[in-house]
């Protein structure tokens, strides 16, 4: 068995902190004995090309040994027009080539044209940060317009929703309209206390039964007349036939009990 494979090894899922972390404990930070942070990097390489933060993003032409024809790089429009007019030296070169191809001025004119195009290309590169800032500005303005439109739509939807909720709240908490009056077919009129009248008739019937021993015919006649009068009183409100029949049936049952 290979050494080290027999015993169980504990492996941390995270790497150990760097050694300089021990110099920045809470106690040392509170006491002020912690070392100062390292200085930020001012020089670095990207894809093999060196960059320095103190220098301009685009190095001047003098660092490359090229003569700079423009003076003010901030006024790039005017400088670009000057360089564009300087391309007229190309016609001088053509004239030299036509008249004296071996004249030493030929090389000078070719160098001038080469330098002019390098200056134009460099001036365009100087304008790249300005172009980038304008592109970001235009992008942000478009995003602001889109967000403003979205916020306006949300406000419109919110106002519409509030109107709907307020209308529903008024319908719930407001005073409800009175119910419509019942029709003639469903109207029930129990005038003069019909139920109370039935109870009184039943009591009168019980009293008549007690007085039956004295006079059998008279109570029967008076009770029958009283029941008919009660029926007329209860049905004079023109109630539904079902209610009238129910009351008449109860009175008939009371008559049969006698």
Swiss-Prot record:
Top-rank taxon, per record: Eukaryota
Disulfide bonds: none
UniProtKB keywords: Activator, Nucleus, Transcription, Transcription regulation
Segments of skewed composition (Acidic residues): 203-217
Alphabetized SUPFAM superfamilies for the sequence: Mediator hinge subcomplex-like
Gene Ontology process terms (BP): embryo development ending in birth or egg hatching; regulation of transcription by RNA polymerase II
Region: Disordered, residue numbers: 1-39, 202-243
One Gene Ontology CC term in the entry: core mediator complex
Subcellular location: Nucleus
Extent of Polar residues compositional bias: 220-229
GO molecular function, one term: transcription coregulator activity
Keyword Transcription set for record: yes
Subunit structure, interactors included: Component of the Mediator complex.
Family: Belongs to the Mediator complex subunit 7 family.
PANTHER family xref list: MEDIATOR OF RNA POLYMERASE II TRANSCRIPTION SUBUNIT 7
Function: Component of the Mediator complex, a coactivator involved in the regulated transcription of nearly all RNA polymerase II-dependent genes. Mediator functions as a bridge to convey information from gene-specific regulatory proteins to the basal RNA polymerase II transcription machinery. Mediator is recruited to promoters by direct interactions with regulatory proteins and serves as a scaffold for the assembly of a functional preinitiation complex with RNA polymerase II and the general transcription factors.
Protein's recorded name: Mediator of RNA polymerase II transcription subunit 7
Annotated organism of origin: Caenorhabditis briggsae
Gene of this entry: let-49
């Amino acid at each position: 068995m290979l050494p080290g494979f027999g015993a169980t090894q504990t492996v941390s899922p995270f790497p150990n902190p760097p050694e300089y972390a021990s110099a920045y404990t809470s106690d040392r930070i509170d006491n002020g004995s912690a070392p100062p942070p390292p200085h930020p990097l001012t020089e670095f390489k990207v894809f093999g090309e060196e960059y320095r933060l103190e220098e301009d993003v685009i190095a001047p032409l003098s660092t490359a040994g090229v003569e700079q024809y423009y003076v003010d790089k901030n006024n790039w429009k005017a400088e670009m027009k000057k360089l564009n007019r300087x391309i007229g030296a190309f016609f001088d070169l053509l004239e030299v080539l036509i008249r004296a191809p071996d004249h030493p001025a030929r090389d000078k004119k070719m160098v001038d044209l080469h330098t002019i195009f390098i200056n134009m290309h460099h001036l365009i590169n100087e304008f790249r940060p300005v172009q980038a800032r304008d592109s970001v500005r235009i992008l942000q303005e478009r995003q602001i317009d889109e967000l403003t439109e979205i916020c306006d739509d949300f406000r419109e939807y919110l106002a519409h929703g509030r109107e709907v909720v307020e209308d529903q709240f008024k319908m719930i908490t407001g005073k409800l309209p009175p119910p419509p009056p019942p029709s003639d077919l469903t109207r029930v009129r129990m005038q003069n206390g019909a139920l109370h009248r039935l109870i009184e008739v039943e009591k009168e019937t019980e009293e008549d039964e007690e007085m039956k021993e004295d006079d059998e015919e008279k109570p029967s006649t008076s009770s029958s007349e009283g029941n008919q009068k009660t029926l007329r009183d209860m049905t004079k409100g023109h109630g539904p036939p079902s209610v009238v029949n129910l009351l008449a049936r109860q009175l008939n049952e009371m008559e049969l009990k006698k």
